[in-house]
Every structure is written in structure tokens, then in C-alpha cells.
């Protein structure tokens, strides 16, 4: 998920892939032969969900019919009060099964800071996440994505994150569910920090969800971790990959993210799981942006050495 950090609105319109061009893409490039599989992150359609244009129960069907994608990544914000509602979760399963779509993971937000230096609130945050591990298991997902958010001295925040992730990973291991951290702002966007946390947790059910676009550590002052280096440091622990895209030039390449280079790193680490499309641009509609990102991801995959 995004941090709202793109400056795409300031870019010239002259080299953008037009809305109409993206919407009129014909004959999608077949994904066969790629060293990875493609999924769709629900956040790519967050505007449609927030406005009520789309309903969470329709996500799997919409993904298959509109984009030809058969794997989905949910965001708990769109069914935040349903974690323990097995009737509702059963409907989600049924909708996915009816359309041949596999549920991959749930991205968890707004359940507290897992790296808070306030122990009471941090342990409550850990407790708040347990129900989502249960929900993920019910939905036949393999993973939940959490945020290692916290403020304070670097090492102290890391220690807090290690303790919380250790607790969650132990619970996840019992249920067969991975707990992964996305580089998602603050210390977590510092790949060396997050890799260090992973080393300390040292649990096979704890890992990372590297996001191509979330390496900005702070805005004031602006500080960004090198994305290519960051991806290399996070891939050893990756249990998923988030292919963030913003805006595109006339050749259909992302203007701020080097997709071919990023995907080469993903391949070089032997990753063969799902790569989730997460379109977060403003110049194209959500549907057009998702389609453009899918085409870019496939082209990048087909060009790997």
C-alpha cells in the first residue's frame, strides 16, 4: 500500500500513456512461461471501494473478469469488522472459488503499532492481529501483511518489532500462516533495518513483502533508501512481492520505478511466487492503471535473463 509520496502530478503530460490507450489494450500478453505468477492487490481499487462503486465480496470476480488475474490480495480496511464473521468469510471464499480465484494474503492496517515503545499498547496491537491470522486461515490465504510501525530510537524500535513479530509468527506457525512486513514508511523503509529485524526474529513463518515503491523513509527531511539495494536486502526473506506502479511514459514504462531491474533482482533470488500488482497512480483510472501495470510486469518478466 502506498504512502502518498508520488510527485507524478507535477510531471509533464506529454509522455504519459493515455487513458484511452491503456483502456484499449487488446489481446493481453499471455503470462505463461514467466518465472512468477501475478496477483492483484485490492488497494489498486481503493477509490472504487471507498466510494461504494465496488463491494469487497465482488473483488475476486471483478479481478478475474476485468483483468484476467486469478489471485487476489485483500486489504482488511474493506472488511474491517468481519475478521471473526465466518458467515461473511465463507461468502468471500465462495465468490473466489466460483470464479477460480485463489486468496493469497490479507494486508492488515489500523490494528495498532507493532513496534511501539509503549509496551501496553504494543501488546494490545499484537493481540489485535491474532484474529486476522485466523481469518487468513479461514480464507485459505498463506500470509498476513503487517506494519512494523513505531517511533523512537532506531534500535529500541527494532527490539520492539522483534518481540511483536516473534509472538505473531509463533501464533502464525501454529495456523500455517506467514506474517510478513512491508517496507511501508519510517524505519521499515530502511531495508537494512528491516532485514536486521528479520534476522533477529529468525522464524520461518516471518518474512517480508518488498514493495517496489515504498523506500521513502521520511519526507522532512526527504530521505530515501536506494530501491534496488533495498530490494536485494529484503528478498532473502520475501514471501510475496508488491509491484507498485504510479504513472507511465509513452512506452508504457513506469516513470519512477525501474521494473526490468527490479524484476531481475526478484528472479535472481529464485523467487517464483506471486507478484502483486499495486497501481497507485493518479493520471489513469484504476482499471487502466492496473492493466498498464500488468502489461509492464509481463514485459519485464519476459525480458529477464
Spans of features found by a protein language model:
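Active-site acidic/histidine proton-transfer and metal-coordination neighborhood
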Residues: 4-9, 22-30, 61, 95-210, ...
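Charged helix-capping and loop-helix junction motifs
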Residues: 54-58, 86-91, 122, 126-130, ...
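Catalytic domains of carbohydrate-active enzymes, especially glycoside hydrolases
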Residues: 55-75, 140
Amino acid at each position: 500500500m502506498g504512502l502518498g509520496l508520488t510527485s507524478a502530478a507535477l510531471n509533464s503530460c506529454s509522455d504519459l500513456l493515455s487513458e484511452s490507450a491503456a483502456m484499449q489494450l487488446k489481446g493481453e500478453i499471455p503470462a505463461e512461461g514467466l518465472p512468477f505468477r501475478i496477483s492483484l492487490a485490492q488497494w489498486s481499487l481503493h477509490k472504487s471501494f471507498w466510494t461504494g462503486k465496488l463491494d469487497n465480496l465482488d473483488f475476486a470476480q471483478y479481478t478475474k473478469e476485468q483483468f484476467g488475474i486469478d489471485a487476489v490480495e485483500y486489504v482488511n480496511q474493506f472488511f474491517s469488522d468481519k475478521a471473526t464473521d465466518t458467515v461473511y468469510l465463507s461468502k468471500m471464499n465462495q465468490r473466489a472459488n466460483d470464479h477460480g480465484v485463489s486468496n493469497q494474503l490479507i494486508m492488515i492496517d489500523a490494528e495498532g503499532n507493532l513496534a511501539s515503545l509503549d509496551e501496553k499498547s504494543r501488546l494490545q496491537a499484537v493481540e489485535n492481529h491474532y484474529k486476522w491470522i485466523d481469518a487468513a486461515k479461514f480464507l485459505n490465504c498463506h500470509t498476513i501483511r503487517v506494519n512494523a510501525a513505531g517511533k523512537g530510537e532506531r534500535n529500541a524500535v527494532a527490539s520492539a518489532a522483534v518481540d511483536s513479530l516473534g509472538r505473531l509468527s509463533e501464533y502464525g506457525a501454529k495456523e500455517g500462516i506467514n506474517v510478513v512486513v512491508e517496507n511501508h514508511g519510517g524505519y521499515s523503509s530502511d531495508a537494512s533495518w528491516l532485514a536486521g529485524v528479520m534476522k533477529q526474529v529468525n522464524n520461518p513463518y516471518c518474512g517480508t513483502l518488498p514493495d517496489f515503491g515504498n523506500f521513502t523513509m521520511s519526507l522532512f527531511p526527504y530521505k530515501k533508501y536506494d530501491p534496488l539495494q533495498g530490494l536485494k536486502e529484503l528478498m532473502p526473506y520475501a514471501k510475496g512481492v508488491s509491484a507498485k506502479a504510479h504513472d507511465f511514459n509513452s512506452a508504457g514504462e513506469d516513470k519512477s520505478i525501474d521494473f526490468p531491474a527490479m524484476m531481475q533482482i526478484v528472479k535472481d533470488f529464485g523467487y517464483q511466487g506471486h507478484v502483486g500488482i499495486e497501481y497507485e497512480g493518479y493520471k489513469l483510472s484504476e482499471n487502466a492503471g492496473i492493466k498498464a501495470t500488468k502489461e509492464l510486469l509481463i514485459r519485464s518478466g519476459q525480458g529477464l535473463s
